[in-house]
Amino acid sequence: MTVTAPNALNFECETGNYHTFCPISCVAWLYQKIEDSFFLVIGTKTCGYFLQNAMGVMIFAEPRYAMAELEEGDISAQLNDYEELKRLCLEIKRDRNPSVIVWIGTCTTEIIKMDLEGLAPKLEAEIGIPIVVARANGLDYAFTQGEDTVLAAMAARCPTSTAISDPEERNPIQRLLNFGKKKEEVQAQSSQYHPHPPLVLFGSLPDPVVTQLTLELKKQGIKVSGWLPAKRYTELPVIDEGYYVAGVNPFLSRTATTLIRRRKCQLITAPFPIGPDGTRTWIEQICATFGIQPQGLAEREAETWQKLSDYLELVRGKSVFFMGDNLLEISLARFLIRCGMRVLEIGIPYMDKRYQAAELALLSQTCAEMGHPLPTIVEKPDNYNQLQRIKALQPDLVITGMAHANPLEARGISTKWSVEFTFAQIHGFGNARDILELVTRPLRRNQALAGLGWQKLVAH
């Protein structure tokens, strides 16, 4: 089925079999991001094996996540769910004493209809630790949506200003920027900001990237009131009705919906700060929302592109095919088209056209400016059909999930794991180089092998 959008982008929906990680993998980066948390995944042995393989076995460190393994007694309702979870949570409290316990529901808890949302408030009151329930199960479209589910649950837990005596104390980034300064200096610095409604940014990013984006907005006179998630659960941002929110990742549509509907926030619809072009447009949209004239962004973007010139020479004219895995595909395709690459197809497990509207508009604009034909966006791609198209098109690079990387390499097609873009620092002006470092690695390897004369794999 083909749908032609008003901006002439072609959308196809194949509803086929595609491969992506399980969303419970979000625990891998969220437990590191929220330092005072403990993640309890409630599932079967399969979930436990997956977590061990996906995150590695930590021998010397005690990780802040665990597996509550469902047994036959749980599934046949012979055991009391409440008592079993209470026993585990009391053990976690005794050993780790976290500020929050996050229960991660799985496919099995969905199938046996475990009422985690009903159990959590009673247990929370009994043990005295907040319990957040997130259904990050394999019924989702992509593994990154696990983070979306957790952040949507946490958005409902963000305090209001009436419940907090000093909201500024809950802003760790602001405290970091003001560290070592006298009170008078802090007050003088706060006068540099333009008057605007409070702004909260949502999306889990490494701390250096959080600081970079906060400083980029500070240069424009925009103060970030907080980030969701914060580094600590006790520092979740204050969110009141009428606050403005902006996302930094394309897979956070549930969180955006929760902030709009339940917390009555205003969503700033903007492309995502991936690549110099996306970062500039993201900042411009936030400035435009607050009626602020952006300063020096064109120069900042031009300077970044200049620093990328060595990589741009490598990728210009090369073709890339996205099989679809982590919902970053539209943003990455738009950036690579701006770099001079040819995008043959954008496969994506799920497309929220409202949340990604600004990103799709920027993709169309980028194609027009670069003289690139509008790529076809295939939602829920059928991997079998994709493999036939890859065989016919012979792209220089395929960005794919792990399942297809080795089979494609065996057929002489260069691949890059899409999961690497999830874990790499790809946001902001300064990190565009990291994206191109990942993209060009297979291309540079091919060049090096060709230089050695090793162009064919010979089987004996």
Swiss-Prot record:
The keyword Oxidoreductase applies. Its cofactor is [4Fe-4S] cluster. The keyword Iron applies. Keywords: 4Fe-4S, ATP-binding, Chlorophyll biosynthesis, Iron, Iron-sulfur, Metal-binding, Nucleotide-binding, Oxidoreductase, Photosynthesis. One of its GO terms (molecular function) is oxidoreductase activity, acting on iron-sulfur proteins as donors. Its EC number is 1.3.7.7. It catalyses: chlorophyllide a + oxidized 2[4Fe-4S]-[ferredoxin] + 2 ADP + 2 phosphate = protochlorophyllide a + reduced 2[4Fe-4S]-[ferredoxin] + 2 ATP + 2 H2O. Gene3D superfamilies: Nitrogenase molybdenum iron protein domain. [4Fe-4S] cluster binds at C22, C47, C107. Binds 1 [4Fe-4S] cluster per heterodimer. The cluster is bound at the heterodimer interface by residues from both subunits. Pathway: Porphyrin-containing compound metabolism; chlorophyll biosynthesis (light-independent). It is an enzyme of class 1 (oxidoreductase). GO terms for biological process: light-independent chlorophyll biosynthetic process; photosynthesis, dark reaction. Component of the dark-operative protochlorophyllide reductase (DPOR) that uses Mg-ATP and reduced ferredoxin to reduce ring D of protochlorophyllide (Pchlide) to form chlorophyllide a (Chlide). This reaction is light-independent. The NB-protein (ChlN-ChlB) is the catalytic component of the complex. HAMAP family: ChlN_BchN. Protochlorophyllide reductase is composed of three subunits; ChlL, ChlN and ChlB. Forms a heterotetramer of two ChlB and two ChlN subunits. Belongs to the BchN/ChlN family. PANTHER family: LIGHT-INDEPENDENT PROTOCHLOROPHYLLIDE REDUCTASE SUBUNIT N (PTHR39429:SF3). This is Light-independent protochlorophyllide reductase subunit N. It comes from Thermosynechococcus vestitus (strain NIES-2133 / IAM M-273 / BP-1). The gene is chlN.
